[in-house]
Regions:
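Conserved Radical SAM active-site core
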Residues: 61-66, 70-92, 99-169
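Generic hydrophobic/packing signal
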Residues: 35, 48, 52, 95-97, ...
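Flexible, acidic/Gly-rich N-terminal and inter-domain linker regions that tether
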Residues: 1-83
Length: 169
Protein backbone atom coordinates (compact mmCIF):
# COMPACT_ATOMS: atom_id res chain seq x y z
CA UNK A 1 0.00 0.00 0.00
CA UNK A 2 2.84 2.40 0.80
CA UNK A 3 4.34 1.97 -2.67
CA UNK A 4 0.98 2.50 -4.35
CA UNK A 5 0.39 5.63 -2.29
CA UNK A 6 3.89 6.91 -3.11
CA UNK A 7 3.14 6.40 -6.81
CA UNK A 8 -0.32 8.01 -6.60
CA UNK A 9 -2.03 4.83 -7.79
CA UNK A 10 -5.76 5.08 -7.00
CA UNK A 11 -7.31 2.27 -4.94
CA UNK A 12 -9.67 1.27 -7.76
CA UNK A 13 -6.65 0.64 -10.03
CA UNK A 14 -5.14 -1.71 -7.44
CA UNK A 15 -7.62 -4.53 -8.09
CA UNK A 16 -5.83 -7.89 -8.32
CA UNK A 17 -2.82 -6.84 -6.26
CA UNK A 18 -1.74 -9.23 -3.52
CA UNK A 19 -1.27 -7.06 -0.44
CA UNK A 20 0.15 -9.95 1.63
CA UNK A 21 2.37 -11.90 -0.76
CA UNK A 22 4.44 -14.93 0.24
CA UNK A 23 7.41 -13.26 -1.47
CA UNK A 24 7.70 -9.84 0.11
CA UNK A 25 7.72 -6.60 -1.82
CA UNK A 26 11.17 -5.01 -1.67
CA UNK A 27 11.80 -1.85 -3.69
CA UNK A 28 14.61 0.66 -3.09
CA UNK A 29 13.60 4.32 -3.19
CA UNK A 30 15.84 5.01 -6.20
CA UNK A 31 14.00 2.36 -8.20
CA UNK A 32 10.58 3.61 -7.07
CA UNK A 33 11.49 7.13 -8.20
CA UNK A 34 11.88 5.84 -11.76
CA UNK A 35 8.35 4.40 -11.88
CA UNK A 36 5.81 6.57 -13.69
CA UNK A 37 3.42 8.20 -11.21
CA UNK A 38 -0.17 6.97 -11.45
CA UNK A 39 0.59 4.23 -14.01
CA UNK A 40 -0.32 0.77 -12.68
CA UNK A 41 0.94 -0.70 -15.99
CA UNK A 42 4.43 0.84 -15.80
CA UNK A 43 6.88 -1.98 -16.67
CA UNK A 44 9.16 -1.10 -13.75
CA UNK A 45 6.22 -1.38 -11.35
CA UNK A 46 5.02 -4.64 -12.91
CA UNK A 47 8.47 -6.14 -12.23
CA UNK A 48 8.02 -5.76 -8.48
CA UNK A 49 4.27 -5.60 -7.83
CA UNK A 50 2.80 -8.82 -6.44
CA UNK A 51 -0.42 -9.91 -8.09
CA UNK A 52 -2.97 -12.38 -6.80
CA UNK A 53 -2.56 -14.32 -10.05
CA UNK A 54 0.92 -15.40 -8.84
CA UNK A 55 -0.86 -17.76 -6.44
CA UNK A 56 -2.74 -19.59 -9.19
CA UNK A 57 -1.49 -23.10 -9.94
CA UNK A 58 -0.47 -23.70 -13.54
CA UNK A 59 -0.09 -27.25 -14.89
CA UNK A 60 3.54 -28.02 -15.68
CA UNK A 61 4.93 -25.23 -13.51
CA UNK A 62 6.72 -26.03 -10.26
CA UNK A 63 7.89 -24.02 -7.24
CA UNK A 64 11.54 -25.05 -7.79
CA UNK A 65 12.04 -24.91 -11.59
CA UNK A 66 15.81 -25.45 -11.34
CA UNK A 67 15.34 -28.33 -8.86
CA UNK A 68 17.90 -26.72 -6.56
CA UNK A 69 16.28 -28.40 -3.58
CA UNK A 70 16.40 -31.88 -5.11
CA UNK A 71 18.67 -33.94 -2.84
CA UNK A 72 18.65 -36.81 -5.35
CA UNK A 73 20.54 -34.57 -7.80
CA UNK A 74 23.25 -33.93 -5.23
CA UNK A 75 21.97 -30.68 -3.79
CA UNK A 76 22.40 -29.95 -0.14
CA UNK A 77 25.43 -32.19 0.30
CA UNK A 78 27.54 -29.13 1.17
CA UNK A 79 25.80 -26.10 2.69
CA UNK A 80 26.03 -23.10 0.38
CA UNK A 81 27.07 -25.10 -2.67
CA UNK A 82 25.03 -26.34 -5.62
CA UNK A 83 26.80 -28.82 -7.89
CA UNK A 84 24.53 -29.52 -10.83
CA UNK A 85 27.00 -29.64 -13.73
CA UNK A 86 30.34 -31.38 -14.12
CA UNK A 87 33.24 -29.02 -13.45
CA UNK A 88 31.08 -26.18 -12.18
CA UNK A 89 29.60 -25.20 -8.81
CA UNK A 90 27.35 -22.39 -7.71
CA UNK A 91 28.11 -20.87 -4.32
CA UNK A 92 25.29 -19.13 -2.44
CA UNK A 93 26.96 -16.04 -0.99
CA UNK A 94 23.98 -14.19 0.44
CA UNK A 95 20.20 -14.61 0.52
CA UNK A 96 19.67 -10.87 0.01
CA UNK A 97 18.87 -8.85 -3.07
CA UNK A 98 18.42 -5.10 -3.35
CA UNK A 99 15.03 -5.65 -4.97
CA UNK A 100 12.56 -8.54 -5.07
CA UNK A 101 11.66 -9.18 -8.70
CA UNK A 102 8.42 -11.06 -9.28
CA UNK A 103 10.16 -13.39 -11.76
CA UNK A 104 12.75 -14.52 -9.18
CA UNK A 105 13.38 -18.25 -9.62
CA UNK A 106 14.88 -18.53 -6.13
CA UNK A 107 11.97 -17.08 -4.18
CA UNK A 108 11.39 -20.49 -2.53
CA UNK A 109 15.06 -21.41 -2.16
CA UNK A 110 15.90 -22.78 1.31
CA UNK A 111 18.38 -20.04 2.24
CA UNK A 112 18.28 -21.12 5.88
CA UNK A 113 20.12 -24.28 4.77
CA UNK A 114 22.83 -22.21 3.04
CA UNK A 115 24.21 -19.66 5.49
CA UNK A 116 27.07 -17.30 4.56
CA UNK A 117 28.89 -18.41 7.73
CA UNK A 118 29.16 -21.88 6.14
CA UNK A 119 31.30 -20.57 3.26
CA UNK A 120 34.35 -22.32 4.71
CA UNK A 121 32.55 -25.66 4.18
CA UNK A 122 31.84 -24.78 0.56
CA UNK A 123 35.44 -23.65 0.03
CA UNK A 124 36.68 -26.91 1.54
CA UNK A 125 34.49 -28.96 -0.79
CA UNK A 126 35.73 -26.98 -3.81
CA UNK A 127 39.34 -27.46 -2.69
CA UNK A 128 38.85 -31.23 -2.43
CA UNK A 129 37.14 -31.66 -5.81
CA UNK A 130 39.83 -30.93 -8.38
CA UNK A 131 37.34 -31.50 -11.22
CA UNK A 132 35.79 -28.10 -10.44
CA UNK A 133 37.00 -25.55 -12.98
CA UNK A 134 34.39 -22.83 -12.49
CA UNK A 135 32.84 -21.25 -9.40
CA UNK A 136 29.75 -19.09 -9.81
CA UNK A 137 29.05 -16.69 -6.96
CA UNK A 138 25.31 -16.24 -6.64
CA UNK A 139 22.59 -15.77 -4.08
CA UNK A 140 20.66 -13.40 -3.73
CA UNK A 141 23.06 -10.85 -5.09
CA UNK A 142 26.74 -11.43 -4.28
CA UNK A 143 27.43 -7.74 -4.91
CA UNK A 144 25.50 -6.95 -1.73
CA UNK A 145 28.37 -8.47 0.24
CA UNK A 146 30.70 -5.89 1.72
CA UNK A 147 33.82 -5.16 -0.33
CA UNK A 148 36.20 -6.87 2.09
CA UNK A 149 34.03 -9.99 2.26
CA UNK A 150 33.69 -10.51 -1.48
CA UNK A 151 37.37 -9.67 -2.04
CA UNK A 152 38.42 -12.26 0.56
CA UNK A 153 36.11 -14.88 -0.95
CA UNK A 154 37.48 -14.29 -4.45
CA UNK A 155 41.06 -14.46 -3.11
CA UNK A 156 40.29 -17.76 -1.36
CA UNK A 157 38.85 -19.25 -4.55
CA UNK A 158 41.68 -17.84 -6.65
CA UNK A 159 44.20 -19.73 -4.50
CA UNK A 160 42.72 -23.03 -5.72
CA UNK A 161 44.90 -23.96 -8.71
CA UNK A 162 42.24 -26.14 -10.37
CA UNK A 163 39.64 -23.34 -10.50
CA UNK A 164 40.01 -21.49 -13.82
CA UNK A 165 37.00 -19.15 -13.73
CA UNK A 166 35.08 -17.20 -11.12
CA UNK A 167 31.76 -15.73 -12.26
CA UNK A 168 29.40 -13.42 -10.44
CA UNK A 169 25.75 -14.12 -11.13
Amino acid sequence: KALLAYLNIPNEAANGIDLQPDFALLVPRGYAQRIEQGNIQDPLLRQVLSLQSENERTPGFVVDPLQEGNVELGYGQTPGLLHKYQGRVLMITTPACAINCRYCFRRHFPYTDHKPKDQHLALGAIAQDTSIREVILSGGDPLLMNDDGIAALIRDIDELAHVRRIRIH
